[in-house]
Amino acid sequence: MDVVKARLGALKGLGETFLGPRDVVAVDIGSYAIKVVLLKQEGAALRLKAWGHLPIGAKAEASPEERKIEIINSLRGFLIEKSVGVREAATALSGNAVIVRYVKFPRLTKTELQTTLATEAEPFIPFDINEVQLGFYILSEMVEDGQKKIETVLVAAKKELVAARVEILQGAGLTPAIMDVDSFALENVHERIRDRKEGQAATLYLNIGHLVTNLSIVESGVTRVVRDVFISGSTMTKAIAKAFQCEPAKADELKKRHGVIVESTEKEKTLAEGNREALGVSQAIGQVARDLVGEVHRSVDFYLSQGPDRAIARIVLSGGTACAKNLDKHLSGELKVPVTVLDPFVFVSGAEAVPADLRPAFGVAVGLALRRNRDWE
């Protein structure tokens, strides 16, 4: 692990940031699929050189070891098939084994904070400090109550999670170079697509994956709130499976086919046709969406309480569930904020082959691939 730690690029500063302009292959390992992206800078443009959406075939009852082997073999096979020569990899973590805290420390230099990080961070981390890998990024310097301080993003990831991810990458023939957090990877995409005319108004991201939803609020290019919410695509699938007393695979198919009914005219038509299947699916998704809306409200209230003149300008959906039919419209109606679905390839040339319904799932992977052009000193 010492060798690996010396080469890791950052959980917003984990280890030494060593990459310059070299390319990295981005590997986003989700619970449902592996997303792989390789970008190449060609003059002023970014070109997609390789991409892959690799469903994880391991069965639900598969052991962690069986699942790991499945992921390694799938990833290695893809790299060989696509003749990907780049061997330095960027990946990201999320879930309940990763903690992100915004902390104010007495003003220290980066070197001083690196030396004393474990001591300074321990009060803010709900894990044994010896069981986590720590990283940090200094956001700003300030004076508070007459004392000089630094505002810092503090990240802690359980060492066993970091080691497991490193083992997968190395098993596939890759060298772990950068380890980030899902929400911070999305921040890189945000920098490319954000409208500077929005000023201080923030964007809320909902990266709705299979098991976890990454919620983040980005203000002026800086992520100010990060949460992982365990209301996700699989939660919707389970609700549909319960309502129809069917297998998860069938429920997932129904979710993709029907989505949620939003317009009153569509609802009236569905009722007139007696389409109980569509109505039942919409009701099941709607119930889960209400729980997600509640979590969004809590996060927004927290963000607004942190300072004056704060507002959410829009919400951006990403992740594999973002394309669920009418989910964006439903959330917009519930939250009274414009909601759009992310296309992380909108500024990338050569991405025409990526299907529209898969694009939102690549938000984290594209953000990781951008780390070649945006790193921290």
Language-model features: where?
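Hydrophobic/aromatic-enriched cytosolic interaction surfaces used to assemble or bind macromolecules
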Residues: 1-377
